[in-house]
């Protein structure tokens, strides 16, 4: 299959226009993911709950390469697509990584943390029990606690809260 015809998750960058682009994509019926979360901020001396992007400036668009590029070229969306460092082609996130990322951000926002993408790689693991059952990622230690990291290659990683060792199984490399 030609790369332009294959459907996948592409990653775009924008500057402070996540909500606008999210709304535009929704109106056009384009599958996308722009995660937001609630934070408490002090505004004019008062503490208020506000919604802000979970990952500043990033927008995930599902489609083929051609349709994604058309959003910029034909519709003038204020964003640009990130490129894979090694191939220089548009950065595409594998479906399983994206499914796990969406699940964690949508359902467990208060139990995850965002980390830079350059974490030291550990064993590949799958969570087999508990809240995060089915999630695959890398086993790491942060502050002496076992956590599973879901890595979006070349972007960032998110880590679960502590996971007991009995809830994990090692995934053999293929």
Residue map of PLM features:
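Acidic-enriched and Gly/Ser
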Residues: 1-124, 149-173
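Short coil-to-beta-strand transition motifs
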Residues: 121, 128-135
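Short beta-strand-centered aromatic/proline hotspots
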Residues: 134-142
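Glycine-centered loop/turn positions within well-structured domains
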Residues: 146
């Amino acid at each position: 299959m030609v790369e332009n015809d294959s459907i996948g998750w592409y990653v775009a960058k924008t500057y402070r226009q996540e909500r606008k682009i999210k709304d535009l994509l929704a109106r056009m019926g384009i599958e996308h993911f722009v995660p937001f979360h609630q934070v408490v901020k002090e505004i004019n001396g008062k503490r208020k709950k506000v919604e802000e992007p979970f990952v500043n400036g990033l927008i995930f668009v599902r489609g083929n390469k051609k349709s994604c590029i058309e959003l910029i070229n034909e519709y003038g969306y204020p964003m640009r697509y990130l490129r894979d460092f090694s191939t220089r082609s548009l950065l595409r996130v594998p479906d399983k990584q994206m499914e796990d990322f969406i699940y964690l951000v949508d359902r467990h926002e208060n139990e995850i943390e965002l980390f830079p993408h350059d974490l030291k790689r550990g064993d590949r693991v799958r969570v087999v029990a508990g809240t995060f059952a089915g999630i695959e990622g890398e086993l790491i230690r942060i502050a002496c606690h076992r956590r599973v990291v879901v890595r979006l290659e070349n972007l960032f990683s998110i880590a679960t809260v502590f996971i007991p060792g009995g809830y994990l199984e090692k995934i053999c490399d293929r």
